[in-house]
Amino acid sequence: MRYIPHAYQAYCERQIVEKTALALWLDMGLGKTSITLSAVNELKFNRFEVQKVLVIAPKKVAEATWQAEAAKWDHTKHLRFSTVLGSLQKRIRAVNAPADLYVINRDNVKWLVDYFRNDWPFDMVVIDEASSFKSQQAQRWKALKSVRAHIRRIVELTGTPAPHSLLDLWPQVYLLDQGERLGR
């Protein structure tokens, strides 16, 4: 199917392409996934600015949503996915398979960081449902923070930032700018 973005979608895609760190907070159903896939396609195949993209998502979303959305559109259906889920052996095989995007559930982020240690291969990370990274005490947040300096581009997606307080936003913003705006 031919992708014809709405003006706000085209704007969001440009922002992802032009900025190295961005939070995209749009309501459900407004196309966060297709916007991001379009930007990844542009960055990887037209600008050659990214090689390996990691998508961190809730398990159900990681299982099929990103792949199904990419398959829908003519300009993204060529993207190759590796789903990094399942047993340890399956995850190791998947993370070493050739792909453009690697999709993992958020509960395996610590494992992935431990697996690669100082040889972090993903130059772009997309956090689908960034509000699940609102606790700086969570292992997934600490793990991602430890490799943040090795990530050239990061995009946070959510339709529900819904903090209980401003303190819930600090960890999400920190992952974007490493403490530049709100402190360390």
Where on the chain are the PLM-derived regions?
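SF2 helicase/translocase NTPase motor core
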Residues: M1-K142, S146-R152, R181-R184
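Conserved helicase ATPase motor motifs in RecA-like P-loop NTPase domains
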Residues: M28-G29, I151-L166, Y174
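PAPS/PAP-binding and catalytic site of the sulfotransferase fold
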Residues: L37, E69, S165-D177
